[in-house]
Amino acid sequence: MSNIVWHQHSVDQAARAKLKGQNPVLLWFTGLSGAGKSTLAGALERALFEAGFHTYLLDGDNVRHGLCKDLGFSVADRDENLRRVGEVAKLMVDAGLVVLSAFISPTREERDSIRARFPEGQFIEVHVSTPLSICEQRDPKGLYVKARRGEISNFTGISSPYEAPLSAELTIDTSKGDLASQVRALIDYLTAIGVINPDKAKALA
């Protein structure tokens, strides 16, 4: 690695963000399977996109079709999965995008490691705190049933722990309220911290 030198480009993040008229950021949605991470992140992305924002949604299932298709679900492979996603998200934020990532990401150490890659204010942790009982009732992929039968090992929430964030920027329980109000809460927060400027916020009203 000693012979590898970082090449500084003439176009930087600030210039890319200025061209797009937005402040780049990573919103990291974490929570149990079935908590509503992908649904919430997808609804927020749709709202931002329709208001003219340049966005990209990284989804836990989708990256395993390509970027991480060589990985399994051992502890080491899950760590590597998130490491890769964190690096991709960093590149996308550097490109000036508003990036949304929806991953169980069960440990604080994993999430804090990804946060550490970003400048202050460019990593926003969104804890989708829907209770296990509700997630298990939803079970959209039938995974909880399989985990209870012992057909899936190391399943987060059943046979493997989930460490809830201690100080997430936002906490949303999708079993309370409707999707529109939950997206509104996210938009209001992004406006309050300056990710969304007031003029563009009007388009999201």
UniProtKB/Swiss-Prot annotation:
Protein name in the entry: Adenylyl-sulfate kinase
Keyword presence, Transcription: no
Record-listed E.C. numbers: 2.7.1.25
Top-level EC class: transferase
GO biological process: hydrogen sulfide biosynthetic process; sulfate assimilation
Positions contributing to ATP binding: 31-38
Keywords of the record: ATP-binding, Kinase, Nucleotide-binding, Phosphoprotein, Transferase
Species this protein is from: Shewanella sp. (strain ANA-3)
Signal sequence residues: none
Catalytic activity: adenosine 5'-phosphosulfate + ATP = 3'-phosphoadenylyl sulfate + ADP + H(+)
GO molecular-function term, one example from the UniProt record: adenylylsulfate kinase activity
Pfam families xref list: APS_kinase (PF01583)
